[in-house]
């Protein structure tokens, strides 16, 4: 999120790209990609494709910066099918400071943006039958959201099951999902591994041993997805599914498993280049290009009602010695299944 924000700088007048400027951008792009892109063979294929386009003079007539960035992105993705990879144009001067180390002002603006959106924690409630629902539309750094997540955990602590709605979640920071995941385990658990090609290193990610607020480790967990669910929430769903900790309900996700960071290409161009790859310690692979396959595949619009019914069945199966509660659950399931059969949805 923060790494992709437009850099601060001095605004310049618009100008037409020259042949030299286009060549500078391409040279820097291919150099960074060939050294750091997470899949070396694919990096070579992309570099070859770009050089062939360049040799055929297909970029020569492009003098608009935004169009040049768009064309390069399309040509890269035509080979890689990696939607984390792309080139952006900035009308403002791009500082030559390290782009993965944002300035204090960048950080201030980023945090303020998050505060105005409640750091994307958008909805929390208890559905009929005592099923908790938490909608998260993006992941900010854990240090920003600790109080929000602890408050959400407290709100959900007396529910009998939890549904996480990621249908409109398009990504975010790595430690944001890890904080939320940590509430659903009793002990430290190995969640994922991340291989960094640029450093030739692998980092393990484990749930946190202690989290503020109550644990949700005893709750059945359901995760809602859509075709638009992408990147960080996909990793959350994929890893929890692989560990057998959650059932995924909804649509196959977007398929973006590669972590990215910004690279300065020139005074007005920036590339987002995936440099690492997260894999599950259970499957030893990821969901890049294929998405997370739901346990129960339904249209996104039907996912909440479907998960609600599944959660109630799970609660009913555990209910003993309380005829009144059992009858309540059976009636609620009957009503919701009738709604489902008639084409109704839950919003």
Report residues per predicted region:
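Extended, small/polar residue-biased N-terminal targeting/export presequences
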Residues: 38-127, 321-347
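C-terminal, low-ordered peptide segments at domain boundaries
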Residues: 7-9, 75-158, 289-307, 311
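Gly/Ser/Thr-rich loop/hinge elements
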Residues: 172-222, 228, 258-262, 276-277, ...
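Mature N-terminal segment immediately following signal peptide/propeptide cleavage
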Residues: 17-48
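A mature extracytoplasmic/lumenal domain signature
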Residues: 89-91, 137-140, 168-170, 197, ...
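Low-complexity, Gly/Ser/Thr/Pro-rich intrinsically disordered linker/tail segments
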Residues: 285-347
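Terminal peptide-recognition signature
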Residues: 29, 76, 134, 164, ...
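Short acidic catalytic loops
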Residues: 134-135, 158-171, 224
